[in-house]
Amino acid sequence: PSSLVGSEMCIRDRLNIKINIQKIDFLKAKFTQKYNSILLDAPCSALGTFRRNPDVTLKIDQSKIKKHQKIQIQMIEKSLKILNKNGFLVYIVCSFHPFETIEVIDKIMQKHKNIKLHKINSHKMIKRQSGYFINPLSFKELGGSDIFFVSVLEKI
């Protein structure tokens, strides 16, 4: 395969994608090939799900969010190692916290000069300096949406 999906198991069912998902410790796994595209749905605080899970806002713990950030950066770093030149890494979290979104991408961009941000052209997205937030009001006909942060990185 030329693509790798790192995600929760439910994404396959939710999106009806026919892919082989293996449950592995991504940071410990050994990869023998490189990929043209990687979708990384990283673990996060889930703050973007507050519309459906209001209690998530009561459980905000800055130290946990900082731990998530560390893991998110490690996962992106590993993804970049197994990403082909001219390949794309799509980083997604269901959070709007700057530590898990903009700050993560800013740290990666500062460290890796061979990475550039790729534009997403969609009226359903809200542009920020290091990525995009999905506009939950764009899906009113479906009852709304959670808030997601998406950043597309291209390895050059």
Put a short name on every predicted segment:
Residues V5, Q22, V90:
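Conserved Rossmann-like nucleotide-binding pocket used by diverse enzymes
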Residues I73-K85:
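A short glycine-rich, Lys/Arg-flanked "PGG" loop and its adjoining helix->strand segment in the class I
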Residues L27-K28, T32-L39, P43, K85-I156:
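C-terminal catalytic and target-recognition region of SAM-dependent MTase-like enzymes
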Residues P1-I11:
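Single conserved hydrophobic/aromatic residue that forms the stacking wall/gate
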Residues F26, D41-M75, S95-E100:
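Mobile active-site "lid"/loop adjacent to the S-adenosyl-L-methionine
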Residues R12, Y35, R52-D55, V104-D106:
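Short, glycine/charged-enriched secondary-structure capping and boundary segments
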Residues R12-T32:
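S-adenosyl-L-methionine
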